C-alpha cells in the first residue's frame, strides 16, 4: 500500500496520483484492481448512494459504515475518509473525538477536512495525534449554502488570493495533501507548483499533482447528469437495467428457474414425507 511518503515522492517525480471516490466493497475492489493509488470515501455518499439532497445529513456513523466496506474491498490501497458536516467545527475536543472514532472503528488511513478558516488548528491537532489529514479547498460541498451554490471558486483576485493563502496555511498546519475542487486551471497549477504537498484536483485542470473523480460518474451508474469536469468512461446503467428486465420477464413467464438452477431430492424421501401423495 502506498503511504504519505510515496505520494510525496510521486509529486516530486511528476507522477500523477490517481484518486477515486468509492463507497462500498464492490467499487473499492474494482478500484484497487484497476490500479487506483488512493480511494476517498466521500460524504457525497449521502447524495450518490443514500438518495439525500445534500451531504449535510451524513453522520459519523455513516462514514464509519461505508469506510469499513471500502477497506474490506481495497486492503492494499490508501483510504481517505471525509469527516462529515459539523463533526469537526463545534470544538477541538469533539473534532478529535469524532476523528478518533472514524479511524479506530473504520481503519481509515487519513481523514479529509473541508475549509480553511477555523480548521487549521484542527489539522494541526489531528496531525500531532497521528492522524494524517487531507485538506479540501475551493468548492466545499458542506459549505455550498454559504458559497452561493455549486460554482467555480477563485475567479476574482480577492477569492483567488484567499485560496492561495488558505492552501499555504493548510500545508503549514500539517496537511499531507490538498484537494482543490472547481478552481480555475491556471490558479490550481500555480498552487500545485508552490506547495510541497500533493495537490489533487477535481474540476481544477490538468496542472495539479493528481485527479479525483467519483466512481459512479466514471462508470455512468445512477447519475442523471454529470458535471462539466467529469469524463465518463462507460455507461453501465443500460446493461444493468436490461439484465434486470430480463430477470423480471423470466420469472413472470416461469422461464426461470430452470432445472439447472434447482436442487433435487430423492423421490422416495419425498414420498416418505408426504405419504406418496
Swiss-Prot record:
It is an enzyme of class 2 (transferase). It comes from the Bacteria. It catalyses: 3-methyl-2-oxobutanoate + (6R)-5,10-methylene-5,6,7,8-tetrahydrofolate + H2O = 2-dehydropantoate + (6S)-5,6,7,8-tetrahydrofolate. GO terms for molecular function: 3-methyl-2-oxobutanoate hydroxymethyltransferase activity; magnesium ion binding. The active site is at 181 (proton acceptor). GO terms for cellular component: cytoplasm. Keywords: Cytoplasm, Magnesium, Metal-binding, Pantothenate biosynthesis, Transferase. Mg(2+) binds at residues 43, 82, 114. Homodecamer; pentamer of dimers. Belongs to the PanB family. This is 3-methyl-2-oxobutanoate hydroxymethyltransferase. It comes from Bacillus licheniformis (strain ATCC 14580 / DSM 13 / JCM 2505 / CCUG 7422 / NBRC 12200 / NCIMB 9375 / NCTC 10341 / NRRL NRS-1264 / Gibson 46).
Amino acid at each position: 500500500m502506498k503511504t504519505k511518503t510515496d505520494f510525496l515522492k510521486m509529486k516530486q517525480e511528476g507522477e500523477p496520483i490517481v484518486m477515486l471516490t468509492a463507497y462500498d466493497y464492490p467499487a473499492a475492489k474494482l478500484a484497487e484492481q484497476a490500479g487506483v493509488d488512493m480511494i476517498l470515501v466521500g460524504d457525497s455518499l449521502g447524495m450518490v448512494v443514500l438518495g439525500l439532497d445534500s451531504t449535510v445529513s451524513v453522520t459519523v456513523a455513516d462514514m464509519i459504515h461505508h469506510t469499513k466496506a471500502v477497506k474490506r474491498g481495497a486492503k492494499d490501497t490508501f483510504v481517505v475518509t471525509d469527516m462529515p458536516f459539523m463533526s469537526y467545527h463545534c470544538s477541538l475536543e469533539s473534532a478529535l473525538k469524532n476523528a478518533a472514532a472514524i479511524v479506530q472503528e473504520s481503519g481509515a488511513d487519513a481523514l479529509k477536512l473541508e475549509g480553511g478558516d477555523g480548521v487549521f488548528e484542527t489539522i494541526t491537532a489531528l496531525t500531532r495525534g497521528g492522524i494524517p489529514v487531507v485538506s479540501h479547498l475551493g468548492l466545499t460541498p458542506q459549505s455550498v449554502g454559504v458559497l452561493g451554490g455549486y460554482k467555480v471558486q477563485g475567479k476574482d483576485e480577492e477569492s483567488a488570493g484567499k485560496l492561495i493563502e488558505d492552501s499555504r496555511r493548510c500545508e503549514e498546519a500539517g496537511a499531507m495533501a490538498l484537494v482543490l475542487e472547481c478552481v480555475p486551471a491556471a490558479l490550481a497549477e500555480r498552487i500545485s507548483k508552490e506547495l510541497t504537498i500533493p495537490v489533487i484536483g477535481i474540476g481544477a485542470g490538468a496542472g495539479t499533482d493528481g485527479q479525483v473523480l467519483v466512481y459512479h460518474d466514471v462508470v455512468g451508474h445512477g447519475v442523471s447528469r454529470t458535471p462539466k469536469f467529469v469524463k465518463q468512461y462507460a455507461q453501465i446503467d443500460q446493461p444493468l437495467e436490461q439484465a434486470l428486465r430480463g430477470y423480471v420477464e423470466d420469472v413472470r413467464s416461469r422461464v426461470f428457474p430452470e432445472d439447472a438452477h434447482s436442487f433435487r431430492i430423492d423421490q422416495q424421501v419425498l414420498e416418505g414425507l408426504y405419504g406418496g401423495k
